[in-house]
Amino acid sequence: MYGLVNRAIQQMVTTHHGEDTWQRIKEPADLLDLDFFSTYQAYPDDVTHRLVAAATEELGLSGDQIMQAFGEYWITYTATEGYEQLLESTGETLPEFLDHLDNLHARAALAFPELQPPSFRCEHHADASMQLEYRSKRRGLAPMVTGLLHGLGKRFRTPLAVDQIASRDQGDATDLFQVRLASPTDPVLPEGGMRHE
């Protein structure tokens, strides 16, 4: 994965848990000699996996919890790292944004030529819910997609509920997410997001 991803993990950890925690995560991840990640350098996926594994031990969270938190953080992080215009041009509403995720990755590939992006297909239903199909060469990143969806909900001020209804990790052909926009009767958390169902 590109250094941009690993830098985002680093910033998420240092922002929420401090620099000392980041240094403690680097040691079991065998990255003590690495001072920084270069945004446009492609790193082996194993580097990211080691960071997540070390973070689970240090923070006492599951890998899925960390990846979901990271997915939500990623939306804000990329907006502040110079990609706000790319995000803005992808869609003015959450449904429109989800329809154009593959276009976003195609444009991002101009700056990241070794990018191996996932593919998304969004299906809209009459009740305003959506099914988002996620396909990737990489495994284990579906929890990040859940976080991304919640991050996008916050970006568009659109409270939502997300349920993963099919999982490659459990033998399904694809990862599939049910996205339901909030109605006035749904329980809403203080930060504006909905409770997980």
Where are these regions (language model features)?
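A general alpha-helix detector
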Residues: L4-M12, R50-A54
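Glycine-centered helix-coil hinge/cap
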Residues: H17-G18, G71
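Short terminal or interdomain "cap/linker" segment that borders an active site or interface and mediates
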Residues: L4-V5, L115-E133, R138, A142, ...
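Secondary-structure capping and boundary motifs in well-ordered enzyme cores
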Residues: M1, Y43-P44, L141
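Amphipathic interaction/junction segments at domain boundaries or subunit interfaces
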Residues: T48-A142
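Long amphipathic alpha-helical segments
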Residues: T21-G60
